[in-house]
Each structure stands twice: as C-alpha cells, then as structure tokens.
Curated annotation (Swiss-Prot):
UniProt: ATP binding residues: G9, P10, A11, A12, A13, G14, K15, G16, T17
CDD domains assigned: CMPK
InterPro entries documented for this protein: Cytidylate_kin, Cytidylate_kinase_dom, P-loop_NTPase
Domain of life: Bacteria
GO CC terms of this entry: cytoplasm
Gene name of the record: cmk
High-level lineage: Bacteria, Pseudomonadati, Pseudomonadota, Alphaproteobacteria, Hyphomicrobiales
Native organism: Agrobacterium fabrum (strain C58 / ATCC 33970) (Agrobacterium tumefaciens (strain C58))
Name recorded for this polypeptide: Cytidylate kinase
Catalytic reaction list: CMP + ATP = CDP + ADP; dCMP + ATP = dCDP + ADP
Keywords from the named record: ATP-binding, Cytoplasm, Kinase, Nucleotide-binding, Transferase
UniProt similarity note: Belongs to the cytidylate kinase family. Type 1 subfamily.
C-alpha cells in the first residue's frame, strides 16, 4: 500500500525544497503539482493558443505527460504568469487533479506539493504539512535567489508580487489555498530548511509506525 505525504503552502515558503529532500530520503516519488499548471500553460504558449479559452486549456491539461516536466524550463517567469491565468479555470484544475491523484497512488510512496494537496488532491493522506513563512521573508528569499542567478531584482516589486499571489491563491473560488484541518504547520520564517526537514521527519516517522 502506498504512503502519501501532502505538502501545501504559499509561494517561496520552502515547500519545494523540503518536498524534494523528503522524497529523496524516503525513496518516494515526488510531484511538484505547480509544474503541471506551468506545463499546461507552456503547451498553450508554444502552440500560440489563447490563455483565456477554458476548453482549449482543458484539452492541453488532459494531454499532459507528467514524466516530461522540466523544472528548469518551466521555472521561467512568463510561464508562471501564464500558469496563474489557467490555474483559476475549474475544468483545468479538474483535469490536473485527476492526474495528480493517479500519481499519488504510486508505490512505495509519494510526496506531492502544491496549494490544494491536503484539501483536494489527497485529503486522506496520512501526513499533511502546511509550510508557510511571512510575506517579507518569502519575498527576501525570492529576491536573493534572483541575485544569486545573476539577475536584477527589485525587492519592492517582488514583495508586491508575493502579496498579489497570496491574494489570488487564497481568494480563488475553486480549491483556495488553506491548511487542511489535520495538517501540521511548519513556519519557516526563522527556520532553516534542515530544521524544517527534521521537524517533518519526526511527523512522518511517527505516521509510518502507525
């Protein structure tokens, strides 16, 4: 029987790094569900198709191959902007959630991270984590990341973008971002990834022994 770990949280809270570390440690399959929305958006952009046509976007979502998700390519800013436009479409969410649910059934276990894993995709997951941090800390991390990659960052613009993204994710009518009632809260504002990982590991190990 498979063991699923559901990890949710806002942008730049550290859930992606934490999820990959957990999956590697336990030998589980990992899926960053945000990449499924980005890949769908990229397919539309590559085909020169509009981002406001739900039927076309749904068709692309249904044809998505989860094995072909390239984080480096899909991390581009313009793809993220396009993804945020299709992520609010109910038919697109429905198609991608179905694919994500199938992924979650892989043996021996899976780690899925996103915005609605513990509430919608895997509501019965034995471990649910909600990874968060203050908007200021998350904007600072994103700013530092851009500088580290040789880019030019505007902290105020990044902070405004983080706040706008939060409002969009939490105010969405379909599957808004919120912690599952039985999720363990990990606030990484003043916590290193290693400390967050050790806290998560304690929770996971306890669940595996049940």
């Amino acid at each position: 029987m498979t063991f699923t770990i559901a990890i949710d949280g806002p942008a730049a809270a550290g859930k992606g790094t934490l999820s990959r570390k957990i999956a590697e440690t336990y030998g589980f399959h990992h899926l960053d569900t945000g990449l499924t929305y980005r890949a769908t958006a990229k397919a539309l952009l590559d085909a020169g198709l509009p981002l406001d046509n739900e039927a076309v976007a749904e068709k692309m979502a249904l044809e998505l191959d989860l094995a072909g998700l390239d984080r480096a390519v899909l991390s581009r800013h313009e793809i993220g902007e396009a993804a945020s436009k299709i992520a609010v479409m109910t038919p697109v969410r429905r198609a991608l959630v179905k694919a994500q649910k199938l992924f979650a059934m892989r043996e021996p276990g899976t780690v899925l991270d996103g915005r609605d894993i513990g509430t919608v995709v895997c509501p019965d997951a034995p471990v649910k984590l909600y990874v968060t941090a203050s908007a200021d800390v998350r904007a600072r991390r994103r700013y530092d990341e851009i500088l580290a990659n040789g880019g030019n960052g505007d902290y105020d613009a990044i902070f405004a973008e983080v706040k706008k993204r939060d409002e969009r994710d939490m105010g969405r009518a379909d599957s808004p971002l919120r912690p599952a009632e039985d999720a363990h809260l990990l606030d990484t504002s003043e916590m290193s990834i290693e400390a967050a990982f050790q806290a998560a590991r304690t929770i996971i190990d306890a669940a595996l022994k049940r």
